[in-house]
Structure formats: structure tokens, C-alpha cells
């Protein structure tokens, strides 16, 4: 067919020229579409208080200074693998808020509050997606529950961290988040890099599931640049978002085919980051591949990193730990009551082990200060 004989675009035809198509080609695999509450509606229900905003502002500034060499404390993102029970999360937050104050001279403690879970295949996708854990997928309820929980935790003076998985959810909760993560499965995703470029909080990018650090380096460079992408406004309208870029992004070493928390791995990663023209500021994920998927190994990882810090290692700026009220994990089985304070996703260390790890890290920071001072003469 020649160019001149191509049919006119549908939008240029008259109604007489454009009868309804015989074949339906739209939404063929869509079962149902429900209205989503606008972000502004949920925010008005649970508005940020002055104390909550101060908690977030103070923590973001502290993390910014850590990332740029202005604060020698250690960032510790610690908490449950995922939130499935808001009551247990509030209990955990109450304990962690006390620990935050106890160790605040050495540690910037941020509670891990993950509402969305990326799945390798299928499974429970988190509190926002299915807040009742029963397959009812009451997402509007999940968004309300998530924001209410974040607000309560911020009111304790405890900052929070979460993983961002889509372009819409941040409009509901991001003002209450002090630090964000982009996971190993999504670090290479263009839309997640674009999202990170516009987030108001510092963001950590995990290395790839195979241990590849390069994709996280590329992600940091991309997120530092301005972007234009599609999302929604606070009123819930489709929108084009233009960003300034995020200078507060860094790498999280989470392991891959092997672990990468030891001194040699840290040095190799730091050199690769520096060779790319970026500041060598690394966070260590004590769980996932670094723990070889055994929650108790997180203690070993944290101890190894603490020893590196005590020897004067300054390129490690933070750790991530999966911790809950009680150790281990449990399966989500319909009709079977859940044990209080036990994860239903990845296994976690318990609270007593958590306090021991925090004490170890606090002492390590103190020793690092001495080592750095001695090195300076």
C-alpha cells in the first residue's frame, strides 16, 4: 500500500466513516476496574502533624549529611521484612523508638516499614494490596492503613523506610517516608529510576540479584538526572511529572550468587563506584543473599561489618537488618491464627538479638571514630 492510500486516522474520520469495530480489542483480560481513592483524600483523613513532619525532615537531613560526609554516624534501617499486622508493627516501633534515643550519638535508626512485596512468582503482595490477608484486595483500605501506621510511628519520633514498587503509591505515603529503597528486581527498571529522581527522600538501590553492582551504579546516575514520566496528582488525575533529580542515592550491597559484605567485596564495590565518578558510600543488607537466606546469619554479617567499621572503614555508611518482635517466620494459612510478632514473608531475627546487634554497631562507630582520629595524627 502506498503512503497516499493509507487510511486516515480514526480521530479524523466522521461518524459515518467510522462504525463500531466488529472485534473488541480492549480490556480483554480485565475482570474488574474499581475506583481508587485520590491521594489527597487519604492525606486529608490522616494529615501529617508538625511533630511527624519534623521527624521526617530531621531524619532526611541526617541521612543526607551521612551520604555527603557531614555526619559520621551509621544509618541503620531495621524492622520487619514486611508489615502484615499493624498492632505488632506499633509495638515494635515503640521499642525501636527507645533504642533510637539510646544509640542516637552513634546510629541514625530508621524503622523498616515495607507495605509492598515484589514476588518472584506469586504470593501475598503486602498490606496495601491485601490488608486483610484473605485475598479480598481492599487496596483503598490498605492505603488508609499504611498511612495511619506511618503517621503513628512518626509521632513517636521514629523515622520510617519503605520500598517503592509503583508510580502511584508514593503520592499517598511518601511525605512520611525518610528513606526509600529500590529493590534488586527493579533497580534496572527505567520507571523506578525515574521515580527515584523525584522522591523527596534519600534512596538506596540494591545490586542485581546476580550480584551485579553496575546496574545500581547506572541507576544512581539516572536518578540524579531530571526526568519526565507519567503518574497521578494528589487529586488523582493523570499527570506528567517533571523531576529535578535526586542527589541522595546510594548502593545497597545485598549479595548475589555469593555474599558481598566482607572487606574485600566492600573494597571492590567502592572502587567500582568511585571509578564511575560517584561517591563511594555503601550500605550493607545483612539479609537476603548476604545471609544466605538464613535469618540468624544476619548477626554474623553485622558483626563482620562492625569489625570493618572498628578498623576505620568509612565507605560503609549504613546497614539494613530484617528484625521483628520474635524470630523466624510463619506461613499464612487460611483459617489458622498467626503467631504475634512473627514475619509471614522472610524470616527475621528477634528483638533480643536486634538490641545486641545495635549495641555492637554503636560500639563499632565509637571505635571507628578513634581509628579515624588516630589516622589523622
Predicted segments, located by residue:
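Conserved phosphate/anionic-ligand binding catalytic regions in large, soluble enzymes, centered on
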Residues: 75-88, 346
Amino acid at each position: 500500500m502506498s503512503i497516499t492510500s493509507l487510511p486516515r486516522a480514526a480521530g479524523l474520520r466522521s461518524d459515518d466513516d467510522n462504525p463500531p469495530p466488529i472485534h473488541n480489542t480492549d480490556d480483554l483480560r480485565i475482570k474488574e476496574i474499581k475506583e481508587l481513592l485520590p491521594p489527597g483524600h487519604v492525606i486529608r483523613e490522616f494529615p501529617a502533624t508538625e511533630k511527624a513532619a519534623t521527624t521526617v525532615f530531621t531524619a532526611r537531613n541526617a541521612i543526607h549529611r551521612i551520604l555527603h560526609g557531614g555526619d559520621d554516624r551509621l544509618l541503620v534501617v531495621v524492622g520487619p521484612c514486611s508489615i502484615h499486622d499493624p498492632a505488632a508493627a506499633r509495638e515494635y516501633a515503640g521499642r525501636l523508638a527507645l533504642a533510637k534515643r539510646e544509640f542516637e550519638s552513634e546510629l541514625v535508626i530508621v524503622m523498616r516499614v515495607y507495605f509492598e512485596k515484589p514476588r518472584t512468582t506469586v504470593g501475598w503482595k503486602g498490606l496495601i494490596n491485601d490488608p486483610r490477608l484473605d485475598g479480598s484486595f481492599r487496596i483503598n483500605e490498605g492505603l488508609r492503613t499504611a498511612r495511619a501506621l506511618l503517621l503513628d510511628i512518626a509521632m513517636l519520633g521514629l523515622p520510617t523506610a519503605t520500598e517503592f514498587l509503583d508510580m502511584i503509591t508514593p503520592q499517598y505515603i511518601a511525605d512520611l517516608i525518610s528513606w526509600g529503597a529500590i529493590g534488586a528486581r527493579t533497580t534496572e527498571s527505567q520507571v523506578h529510576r525515574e521515580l527515584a529522581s523525584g522522591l523527596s527522600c534519600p534512596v538506596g538501590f540494591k545490586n542485581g540479584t546476580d550480584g551485579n553492582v553496575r546496574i545500581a551504579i547506572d541507576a544512581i546516575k539516572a536518578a540524579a538526572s531530571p526526568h519526565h514520566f507519567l503518574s497521578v496528582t494528589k487529586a488523582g488525575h493523570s499527570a506528567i511529572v517533571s523531576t529535578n533529580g535526586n542527589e541522595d542515592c546510594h548502593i545497597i550491597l545485598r549479595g548475589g550468587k555469593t555474599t558481598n559484605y566482607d572487606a574485600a567485596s566492600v573494597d571492590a564495590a567502592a572502587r567500582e563506584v568511585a571509578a564511575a565518578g560517584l561517591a563511594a558510600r555503601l550500605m550493607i543488607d545483612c539479609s537476603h543473599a548476604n545471609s544466605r537466606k538464613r535469618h540468624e546469619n544476619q548477626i554474623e554479617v553485622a558483626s563482620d561489618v562492625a569489625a570493618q567499621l572498628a578498623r576505620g572503614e568509612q565507605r560503609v555508611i549504613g546497614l539494613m537488618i530484617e528484625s521483628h518482635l520474635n524470630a523466624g517466620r510463619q506461613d499464612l494459612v487460611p483459617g489458622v491464627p498467626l503467631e504475634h510478632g512473627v514475619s509471614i514473608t522472610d524470616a527475621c531475627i528477634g528483638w533480643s538479638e536486634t538490641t545486641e546487634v545495635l549495641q555492637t554497631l554503636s560500639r563499632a562507630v565509637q571505635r571507628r571514630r578513634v581509628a579515624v582520629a588516630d589516622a589523622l595524627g
